[in-house]
């Protein structure tokens, strides 16, 4: 039972007045950049805030993210913060019954500005400040780390006194830079040498380049894994500082897609490492959600949800695309996709476009409305989707993504291995050529076309998963650590089946290979939990469920907008009843369940997407 309090997050689910609700979120002054604001300093910030909040409340927004922008004073070991705008935001939102999360870190909130605190690249050049690179200090620099911890604690303590503050965000889009290799700060190298000495290797120097084709990749792998571990440990450490100030406020960060895409080993961030320690897996997502890119959009969400689920937790879209030039169709499609991947909250970025300064980073670039409050093209459709989430939120938010019985291995070791052997002299993360990442993308797409969403898992958690896997797909046979290989063998001893993707044959090789490769559909048919399918190749189905009911998110991801007439969905799971509820935008209708040779439901008209609610049998 959840205690009835005005606002709370409990295991990633938002409760308001004791009722579980889907998080319908937005942002207001969420940035530390002085030119990323809706109202300039000389404007009527407080008057316009009240007007904006009234509009947001009318649109069913129930949670907002802001940033702890303020000033700090130090007295001995105590840091005090002053946040007049943030304080006013918290108070005004509480008056209208809206929850608040606070981003506690901007651009390294250190107060001492140590001369040696910056990250260094492979040429010992300090990282240059950039508005979109939020962590610039070495995460191993004790002085900078301590300063950030103290400031994080001070911010959390200040905002923790507001009853509607339910969550704390640690940094924004944290990762090593896209360009160059990091971090070669002396403090990082010293920590690396200590770690290697504990393994029996004295005076180990980190490599400054990837190995040549005839060199051992292991030194590079060890160095990248060390940096990733330290980077994510740093985020988790700051999360603990925030948590110590308000234990019932849930912690999260807002990761980009980089943990599971090309360049992941260079950038260091990892969903699983953060999921293990923080309360929520939070992410940013601006990928296109139509056409061929739809699968990558879905894959990133499913990986984030999987990382959370492995530890019995949930994921949120802390920033979801709401560009001012976004079409109504794009907004609707991405929302149905997010619902189906199991998000417990969507915080569309943002409510109002940034004020247009002469040198604004993103003037009027993101928002439901433009800075002058002119509605964007998507505005009316966005409000309809908000209303859908408001009306159906309790039917959605307490359901979990269906665990369909087939996993895909996530391996940081393999990511580092393929970074070492595939990327040569490339120093730009987005130009990566890691073969295993391309294999992952191909494998995910194959199973998605069988209407099976793969569950991403690490080898280290295979023996203690809170859900059952009958089969595990390994994207590439090479590049695994000895520990991972041992865990795969134990998984098979416990009755699981391991398949290795063969890129050459575009099929799968069982671990006990006896001359026959198998196709994705064969694995899906034998080991997958099939819920439903549809013949249209540009329609996807995603599945949520509780003990009594399925929620099937139906997504039309075709490039161009269309209306599909009489879309027939075949049901493979056992269901009961003669009809089922279908909700799409403002439309609500009951559809007949046809029980002939096949059990089907026909949607008379589908435009962009919708949700079917069907009772389990």
Task: Give residue ranges: language-model regions.
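N-terminal carbohydrate-binding accessory modules
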Residues: 1-58
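Conserved, mostly hydrophobic/aromatic
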Residues: 18, 56, 155, 168, ...
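Hydrophobic faces of well-ordered beta-strands that scaffold small-molecule active sites
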Residues: 22-26, 64-66, 100-104, 166-170, ...
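The substrate-binding groove and active-site-proximal loops of carbohydrate-active enzymes
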Residues: 29-46, 67-83, 130-149, 216-233, ...
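Short, acidic/polar
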Residues: 38-56, 148-155, 262-274, 327-335, ...
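Aromatic-lined substrate-binding rim segments of carbohydrate-active enzymes
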Residues: 46-124, 230-245
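Polysaccharide-binding and catalytic clefts of secreted carbohydrate-active enzymes
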Residues: 122-297
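Carbohydrate-binding surfaces of carbohydrate-active enzymes
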Residues: 289-617
């Amino acid at each position: 039972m959840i205690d009835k309090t005005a606002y709370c997050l409990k295991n990633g689910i938002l409760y308001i007045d004791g009722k579980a609700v889907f998080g319908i979120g937005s942002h207001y002054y969420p940035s530390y950049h002085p030119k990323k604001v809706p109202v300039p300093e000389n404007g009527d910030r407080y008057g316009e805030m009240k007007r904006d909040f009234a509009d947001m409340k009318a649109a069913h927004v129930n949670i907002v993210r802001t940033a702890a922008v303020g000033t700090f004073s130090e007295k001995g070991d105590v840091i005090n913060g002053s946040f007049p705008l943030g304080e006013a935001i918290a108070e005004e939102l509480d008056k209208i019954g809206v929850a608040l999360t606070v981003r506690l870190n901007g651009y390294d909130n250190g107060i001492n500005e140590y001369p040696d605190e910056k990250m260094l690249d492979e040429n010992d050049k300090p990282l240059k400040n950039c508005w979109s690179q939020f962590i610039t200090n070495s995460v191993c620099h004790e002085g900078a780390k301590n300063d950030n911890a103290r400031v994080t604690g001070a911010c959390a303590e200040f905002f923790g006194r507001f009853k509607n503050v339910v969550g704390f965000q640690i940094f924004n889009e944290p990762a090593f830079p896209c360009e160059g290799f990091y971090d070669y700060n002396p403090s990082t190298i010293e920590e690396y040498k200590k770690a290697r000495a504990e393994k029996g290797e004295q005076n180990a120097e980190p490599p400054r380049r990837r190995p040549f084709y005839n060199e051992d990749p292991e030194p590079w792998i060890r160095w990248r894994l060390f940096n990733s571990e330290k980077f994510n440990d740093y985020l988790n450490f700051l999360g603990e500082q925030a948590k110590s100030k308000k234990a019932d406020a849930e912690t999260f960060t807002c990761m980009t897609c980089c943990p599971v895409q090309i360049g992941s080993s260079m950038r260091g961030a990892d969903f699983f490492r953060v999921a293990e320690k923080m309360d929520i897996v939070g992410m940013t997502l601006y990928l296109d959600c139509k056409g061929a890119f739809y699968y990558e959009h879905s894959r990133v969400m499913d990986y984030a949800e999987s990382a959370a689920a492995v530890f019995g937790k949930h994921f949120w879209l802390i920033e979801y695309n709401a560009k001012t030039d976004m079409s109504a169709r794009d907004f609707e499609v991405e929302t149905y996709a997010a619902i189906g991947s199991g998000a417990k909250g969507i915080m569309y970025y943002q409510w109002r476009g940034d004020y247009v300064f002469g040198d604004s980073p993103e003037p009027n670039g993101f928002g439901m409305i433009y800075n002058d409050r002119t509605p964007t093209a998507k505005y009316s459709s966005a409000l309809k989707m908000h209303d859908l989430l408001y009306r159906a939120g309790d039917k959605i938010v307490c359901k979990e993504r269906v665990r369909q019985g087939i996993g895909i291995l996530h391996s940081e070791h393999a990511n580092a291995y393929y970074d070492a052997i595939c990327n040569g002299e490339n120093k730009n993360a987005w130009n990566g050529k890691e073969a295993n990442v391309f294999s992952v993308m191909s494998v995910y797409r194959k199973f998605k076309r069988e209407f099976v969403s793969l569950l991403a898992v690490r080898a280290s958690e295979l023996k203690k998963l809170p859900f059952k896997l009958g089969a595990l797909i390994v994207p590439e046979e090479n590049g695994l650590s000895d520990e991972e290989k041992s865990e795969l063998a134990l998984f098979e001893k416990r009755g699981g089946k391991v398949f290795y993707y063969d890129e050459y044959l575009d099929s799968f090789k069982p671990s006990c290979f006896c001359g026959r490769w198998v196709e994705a559909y064969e694995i899906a048919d034998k080991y997958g939990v099939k819920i439903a399918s549809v013949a249209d190749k540009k329609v996807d189905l995603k599945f949520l469920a509780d003990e009594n009911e399925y929620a099937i998110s139906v997504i039309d991801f075709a490039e161009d907008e269309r209306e599909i007439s009489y879309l027939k969905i075949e049901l493979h799971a056992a269901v009961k009843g003669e009809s089922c509820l279908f909700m799409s935008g403002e439309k609500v209708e009951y559809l007949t369940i046809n029980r002939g040779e096949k059990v089907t439901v026909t949607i008379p008209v589908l435009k962009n997407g919708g949700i079917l609610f069907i009772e389990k049998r």
